[in-house]
């Protein structure tokens, strides 16, 4: 049976006006928040505890940092044009800077999906997996 994850009803306040969507693979589906505005992209998941983290998509994002994070996260790098996973960096601890795979990712084509630590593996999100993205 496929794994399904939904966003909690009591999302942190910073996500109140953010867009939401669902990603589906052959084995899983999960909801996520879309960080499409600068203030939300800047703040992201920083300052949230492990139990408060939610999946967060950062469109047009070739690098991420975990400065200000209180818990480890997974980052799944997506090719936005093909909706395919390029790579996954798992269990990234706070105070790290990570770039998308490849020497120079195509500008605007890469997206980063931040997840609570362990979620990428639990949802079967690895290189080569195709996602079907559905706006909520």
Show the residue positions of the predicted features:
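Compact, glycine-rich, soluble single-domain proteins
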Residues: 2-136
């Amino acid at each position: 049976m496929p794994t399904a994850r939904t966003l909690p009803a009591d999302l942190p306040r910073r996500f109140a006006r953010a867009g939401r969507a669902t990603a589906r693979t052959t084995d899983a589906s999960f909801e996520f928040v879309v960080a499409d505005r600068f203030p939300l992209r800047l703040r992201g998941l920083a300052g949230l505890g492990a139990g408060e983290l939610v999946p967060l998509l950062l469109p047009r994002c070739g690098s991420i940092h975990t400065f200000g994070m209180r818990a480890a996260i997974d980052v799944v790098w997506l090719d936005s044009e093909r909706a395919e996973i390029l790579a996954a960096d798992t269990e990234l601890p706070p105070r790290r800077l990570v770039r998308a795979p490849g020497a120079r990712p195509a500008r605007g084509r890469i997206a980063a999906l931040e997840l609570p630590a362990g979620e990428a593996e639990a949802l079967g999100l690895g290189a080569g997996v195709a996602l079907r993205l559905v706006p909520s």
